[in-house]
Amino acid sequence: WQRQLLARQPNNAQGWRQLAALQQLSGSHDKSLATLRAAYQKGLRFNESELDNLVLLAGAADQPWQGAKLLAGMLDQGLLPRTSAREERLGLLWWQARERSKSAQVFRELAQRSGSAKHWLHLAQLELEQARWQAGLDALAKAERAGAERSKVRAWRQWAESELSYQREKHVASAG
């Protein structure tokens, strides 16, 4: 019945929201996301919390890449103000989408602004996942200075240093 209502009144924003809410309640996060995206593309406008919800729906629908693209676009276009929470969400969505370099860039900027141990640890983990050992070690040092848990930093540092040492030995062996 909700779709019939939309067919008769396609510019009724409330109808689109209701259909998306019903789809979300029934567990069809992907359909709810598609409904809201269709409404948005039709030119219907949403408030800030609805735009945030659209991004969250992408994550709930197991579409982190879509969520990251949506959020990045909304931030770049000024549709949503840049906040630390949104930047962190963007970094996590890129990470879930396996776009580690984009995620690392977001967390690097966020960590530099916030000085948060959590953000430095996220950056360190991303750098280490990409076998960027020295960059990971640098981020770990900053995380430790920012108050990160020493045992976690120590374990990651030992692993990164052993990998870096192995890479150097391998390089020396191949050069000789």
Model-derived features: positions:
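Alpha-solenoid helical repeat scaffolds
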Residues: 1-176
